[in-house]
Amino acid sequence: MPVNSAVVESRAMGRLCSSRYERLARQQGWMRICGIDEVGRGSLFGPVVAAAVVLNPRRRIVGLDDSKKLTHDRREELAQRIREHALAWAVAEIDASRIDAWNIYQASRQAMLAAVGNIRPAADYLLIDAMELPLSIEQKALIHGDARSISIAAASILAKVERDHLMDDFDQLYPQYGLAQNRGYSTPDHLEALKRYGPTPLHRFSYAPVRESTCWAVNATQEPLPLAEISVATTPATSAATAASTSTPGTTAPVLD
């Protein structure tokens, strides 16, 4: 069984997004290299979303970078190319009730575990953005990994696009909070809406701005979903054609402790 040898690097240099870490892993004999990242840790509303991506080394995707540096249209374009050309990808989300029950660190970790657990065939090497995972898979944690590794960048793009789509849907349910624009983060307009309307059941009540908003107790009615159910969208593809046709959003994956 491979030894878990996660290494966290914090150097400020060398943050140009490239395939350097993927090449080094292949030189050591690892073939299915999986990038992992999450989006939404700082949001006051909705789920945290994680993605895992195994890129195809023979199908280069130009322009991969930290999702925060990309425009909305560029992220959408790259997300489609990732889904079409990656060897495998999976996206998992942890809802606000579990974030409140567990804390955001544990929720983010569980989302990552659920995503990587749905990569088929399984990855043999992990590149993770700033976190170690309790798995017996060789792994490397990189500070600012989404700006340094193309695999982590690809995961950050898929996670960001998926979460943005969710926020667009939630904006239809709760238009007064401006979720399509602020994505649930603590912008002045969102904080003002919290003061005026109070939070929704999908806000994170463990976060101070939500907890301290007026009338929050009246709205805190959401019951945590069963902890054994995590929403996962996954495409365990073996070819670009398969990747484009076998996405199965809404399947569930077990919680991995």
Regions found by a protein language model. Name each.
Residues M1-D257:
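RNase H-like, Mg2+-dependent phosphodiesterase core
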